């Protein structure tokens, strides 16, 4: 559930002919201490994958980092040959 203090994005890149089935999730939330955290999870669909959580002292900094991450997902077609699509 998203609150005014949280946002999330979910993407998948699927191409059976290239054996590509990737998922990428991004969450921005405010923790109990007022810091903004960015949690990223990625990996092959159906696996545990990897996760990284990073904390920032303010929301503005976290928003800049999140925008950079979203921009990188948009460039996947150049890197892996398959475009990430938003999953609702």
PLM feature spans:
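Short aromatic-glycine-(Arg/Gly/Cys) micro-motifs in beta-strand/loop hairpins
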Residues: 25-53, 67
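Short N-terminal "domain-start" leader segments
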Residues: 1-37
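A short, charged, amphipathic alpha-helix used as a generic interaction element across diverse proteins
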Residues: 48-50, 56-74
